[in-house]
Structures are given as C-alpha cells and as structure tokens.
Amino acid sequence: VSSGGTGPSYNVPSAIAVTYYYRIILTDITNGCDDPAPVVVMIQVEPQPAVTISASNTNLCIGGTSTITSTVTNGSGFLSYQWQSSADGSTWANITNQGNGASYAVPTGSANSTYYRVMVTDAANGCNDPVSSSVLVVVQPQPAVTISINNPVVCIGGSALISSTITNGTGNFTYQWQSSPNGNNPWTNISVNGTSATYSPPTGVAGSTYYRLVLTDNGNGCADPVSSALQFVVQPQPSVTIAVNNPSIC
C-alpha cells in the first residue's frame, strides 16, 4: 500500500463495495531479530443496505390475515427491525407488540385503514439505516347484501328487475342468484343471466317464485352473505266477459 501503508494502523478505503485482503509485513531493525511472518486479513466493504416491503393482503375483512414481509438488499446482514404504523401516512409511531421482526402480522380485529413501514438498523460500521416505503392495509367490515324488486307482481310478458345493495366488504364480489318455488329449500342456482348484480326474472309462465342472492366476497377473511328472499308473482293476462239479463226487450 503506497499511501498510509507504513504505520502501525491503516484506514481501509470504503468508497466502493469490494473485498480487500491485507497483510502487514513487520521488520525489526534490531540486529539479530527475526521478522515475523505476515498476517493476512480480509475486509469486506458492502454496498449500503436498502429495504422494501410487500403485504400478502392489502384489502381484507375483519378476521382475515395479512402479513407484511421485508426484503433487505446489501448491507452487512447484522440487522434489527422496527415496524411503524400511521393513520395518515405522515405521522408515524413505533409498533411495540410484535413489531421487531423481519415480517409483521397486521391486526385485523376491527375495521381500519392503516399505513405500515419498517425501519432497518444495520449494526456494521458506516452502514445507513434505511426506511422502507409505506403500504396501506384496509380492514373492511364484513359484507351484507339486501335485494329489492321494482315490480313484485306482473302479468305474463311483463318485466321486472331485482336489484342488490351491498354494504361493506372489499368490493371484489361475485354473484349467484337462486330461485325457490316456496321460499324454502331447495334453492337452485340460476344459470341463465344469474351471475350479475341485478336479475330480470322470466315472465313467460304464470306462477309464484321466490328469489335470493348469494354474494361471494373474494377478499381474505370475508364472509359470503345471503340476502333474504322476496316473492315474485306472474299473473295470467286478464280477460273479461259480459252478460245481459234481458237480451230481448220491448
């Protein structure tokens, strides 16, 4: 080493990530003294650490599960973690309960919208302590569904529309309309046009039919609610007859 390499200590350059091997050659100038064998050491200069996070579920229902996992690149590997939460993404607080691991299990016992991030501390000399970007996890109330019909009684050939109203849930829904002749079991899935948010019941034959909607929320931890049933009646077309009491008079 040409610069600074003749003293009892040496400052290793750390501007770039590289592996160095160093040895010291000691010369004892006293007459008759042996020169000890060189000692070799390895110095590893690592790139500065960086951290990213990802959540298994960012939109879920109460009681579901979401785990946020951190991925650290570079650095020395001598790491410690501090997870933080924020209601608005700007004011942060340390998470004291289970908030010091490489991953974090989001609490889902109540509906909330919370931002999360992790601070990583690298214990090696000269290493930065990176902070991840944030991820928003929304815990929704369980979904519920109701249905209504614009014309509960029509004549053959008329028209009606059954509409659904959904509250809460993640919004990632699928629909299955069902029919029953009496409002009790068995309920039969409607295969023709029966998988939308609304349903137009057939009116070609007179009769009474009950309808309901089975809603599937595809979010993690979400229940699949079933609406109450409503009755739809198709009446025969009206007909009229007349009679006269005295068909012939003076």
Report each predicted region and the residues it spans:
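Proline-enriched interdomain boundary motifs that mark the N-terminal boundary
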Residues: 47-55, 141-149, 236-244
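Short, solvent-exposed loop/turn segments at the edges of extracellular beta-sandwich modules
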Residues: 27-34, 121-128, 216-223
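A short beta-strand segment in extracellular, disulfide-stabilized domains
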Residues: 64-72, 158-167
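Conserved Ser/Thr-centered positions that define the repeating blades of beta-propeller domains
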Residues: 1, 23, 83-86, 117, ...
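Surface-exposed, flexible coil segments in extracellular/virion-facing regions
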Residues: 1-14, 84-108, 178-203
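Interdomain boundary/hinge segments at the C-termini of tandem beta-sandwich modules
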Residues: 41-47, 135-141, 230-236
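Solvent-exposed loop segments of extracellular immunoglobulin-like
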Residues: 72-85, 166-179, 183
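Short, solvent-exposed loop/linker segments at the N-terminal edge
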Residues: 58-64, 152-158, 247-250
